[in-house]
């Protein structure tokens, strides 16, 4: 994902590009149904990547507050993620020159989440 990062872009753009890249691979493997864009729009990636793409590095390893996420009420963060179909945690910030951040895309095949989605007929 580092190749697409440009100064002043929103981190959500990078996060969404990671979702799309991973979804395209999963569709190609037959693990997600339909076009990748439809799967992402439907929230399928929250089942397999229920976290942000990465985080900034600073005085604290997970310097979330400096990146626009002022609330550490994880319940409300999870609720917003479910409503938007994306993980919004640690994504509400603009990338500025000199920003240091991690790039941690990853898929987690969590049986409880997969079973829940299957039971609901999703993805």
Where are the language model's segments positioned?
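Active-site neighborhoods and metal-handling regions in enzymes and metal-associated proteins
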Residues: 1-123
